[in-house]
UniProtKB/Swiss-Prot annotation:
One of its GO terms (biological process) is cholesterol homeostasis. It catalyses: a triacylglycerol + H2O = a diacylglycerol + a fatty acid + H(+); a 1-acyl-sn-glycero-3-phosphocholine + H2O = sn-glycerol 3-phosphocholine + a fatty acid + H(+); a 1,2-diacyl-sn-glycero-3-phosphocholine + H2O = a 2-acyl-sn-glycero-3-phosphocholine + a fatty acid + H(+); 1,2,3-tri-(9Z-octadecenoyl)-glycerol + H2O = di-(9Z)-octadecenoylglycerol + (9Z)-octadecenoate + H(+). This is Hepatic triacylglycerol lipase. Its EC number is 3.1.1.3, 3.1.1.5, 3.1.1.32. One of its GO terms (cellular component) is high-density lipoprotein particle. The gene is LIPC. Residues 1-22 form the signal peptide.
Length: 499
């Protein structure tokens, strides 16, 4: 088991504990009303510290000032277009992170859907002890709400045409902007990118981002692995649709092997850089959805990642599925929906999901421990030797269900090659044992029979059944590869459904 993420999470939690203890604060969710009152008394100290930047033809931000309509003209604000505002999170070094400029460029690269692209720069309030930065989120949210009200009054920009994209603490800033804007109409959309967990997990909806804060709220959870009661990203659902890539706890390609060397060289500031991989993956998944609009990542409703890994949750009936990122289908719901998907370790992050159901008949008296590989041939591409491990071994007459993901679109699946990947030595032992020991009343080589392979493609929702090309020999032997082709099987269940 890889213990590096565990060690890192413990270090992060200890850092927050140390900060909180130094400030005499508790990490338990505290009613935000008391915090807000303390912040409001010092509001004049922070009056001008939040900046609102607009990005025109260049990626150099132009500052918009509330009650200064001339700045709108100077910055090239187009009131006929929607407004998308990016809100960053907690800062350790006081510097705006590189992903901001990547997202700005990605948003501006949508010629079919032009928008005003803005940034809420609250770096001076975010660059502080975490607990203090948390307290500042409500204040900054109110300032964002004030900006939106002013734009509505001065240039008639409808708040329903506003999309706030908040990362980490910025997600909760977005929520406070939505809850404090007032009036009968809500902000159009809020996207929470791995919304911060500490001091928000388990709190009331009014004290964090929640579905009530906008007409539509979507959230992407990428670093929710919990230790000592805390997780970097919030784990609980906070939107109308909550996406959990790879289960949401940790992300592929995020290696912690260099963590200890970095700490030795740079001190505990190295933790901040290491955390970015999984926490910031939410940002890059969202950017990826903008850059690869033609290949959106599909997500599927499921109870948990364990069920999803068995391929049990690929049904998209009645519009149950949705796409992750900018182009999500916006459907407000009365109850949050949790969706799961698998991604690659790098952009483009999209994979293709398949459920495989394999029916084995083990005619021996004990479970067979072994590994297999599958090679898939599609109308577009082929994939060779995908490893398959079936838990505790193959018991008698059982169907196994599991999820396979592919990095490429192979088209329609037309053939499967299934191989028992034991050594030739094991094959000789297998034959010898069967010669010595008679297996019940069956034929000499009875043992492991592979009857059918049923497949469901998540992205296309196509169902297929594959049978052995040689129907006279269904026995699978060590080192042997069998070819399976499409076939039609009418089961009793399907007959009942037809009726």
């Amino acid at each position: 088991m890889d213990t590096s993420p565990l060690c890192f999470s413990i270090l992060l939690v200890l850092c927050i504990f140390i900060q909180s203890s130094a400030l005499g604060q508790s990490l338990k969710p505290e009613p935000f009303g008391r915090r807000a009152q303390a912040v409001e008394t010092n509001k004049t100290l922070h009056e001008m510290k939040t900046r609102f930047l607009l990005f025109g033809e260049t990626n150099q931000g132009c500052q918009i000032r509330i009650n200064h309509p001339d700045t709108l003209q100077e910055c090239g604000f187009n009131s006929s277009l929607p407004l998308v505002m990016i809100i960053h999170g907690w800062s350790v070094d006081g510097v705006l992170e590189n992903w901001i400029w990547q997202m700005v460029a990605a948003l501006k690269s949508q010629p079919a859907q032009p928008v005003n692209v803005g940034l809420v720069d609250w770096i001076t309030l975010a660059h502080d002890h975490y607990t203090i930065a948390v307290r500042n989120t409500r204040l900054v949210g109110k300032e964002v709400a004030a900006l939106l009200r002013w734009l509505e009054e001065s240039v008639q920009l409808s708040r329903s045409h506003v999309h706030l994209i908040g990362y980490s603490l910025g997600a909760h800033v977005s929520g406070f902007a939505g809850s404090s804007i007032g009036g009968t109409h809500k902000i159009g959309r809020i996207t929470g990118l791995d919304a911060a967990g500490p001091l928000f997990e388990g709190s009331a909806p009014s004290n964090r981002l929640s579905p009530d804060d906008a007409n539509f709220v979507d959230a992407i959870h990428t670093f929710t692995r919990e230790h000592m009661g805390l997780s970097v990203g919030i784990k609980q659902p906070i939107g109308h649709y909550d996406f959990y890539p790879n289960g949401g706890s940790f992300q592929p390609g995020c290696h912690f092997l260099e963590l200890y060397r970095h700490i030795a060289q740079h001190g505990f500031n190295a933790i901040t850089q290491t955390i970015k991989c999984s926490h910031e993956r939410s940002v890059h998944l969202f950017i990826d959805s903008l850059l690869h609009a033609g290949t959106q990542s599909m997500a599927y409703p499921c109870g948990d990642m364990n069920s999803f890994s068995q391929g049990l949750c690929l049904s998209c009936k009645k519009g149950r599925c949705n796409t992750l990122g900018y182009h999500v289908r916006q459907e407000p719901r009365s109850k949050s929906k949790r969706l799961f998907l698998v991604t690659r370790a790098q952009s483009p992050f999209k994979v293709y999901h398949y459920q495989f159901k394999i029916q084995f008949i083990n005619q021996t008296e004990t479970p067979i421990q072994t590994t297999f590989t599958m090679s898939l041939l599609g109308t577009k591409e082929k994939m060779q030797k995908i490893p398959i491990t079936l838990g505790k071994g193959i018991a008698s007459n059982k169907t196994y269900s599991f999820l396979i993901t592919l990095d490429v679109d192979i088209g329609e699946l037309i053939m499967i090659k299934f191989k028992w990947e034991n050594s030739a030595v094991w094959a000789n032992v297998w034959d010898t044992v069967q010669t010595i020991i008679p297996w019940s009343t069956g034929p000499r080589h009875s043992g492991l029979v592979l009857k059918t392979i049923r497949v469901k493609a998540g992205e296309t929702q196509q169902r297929m059944t594959f049978c052995s090309e040689n129907t006279d020999d269904l026995l699978l032997r060590p080192t042997q590869e069998k070819i399976f082709v499409k076939c039609e099987i009418k089961s009793k269940t399907s007959k009942r459904k037809i009726r």
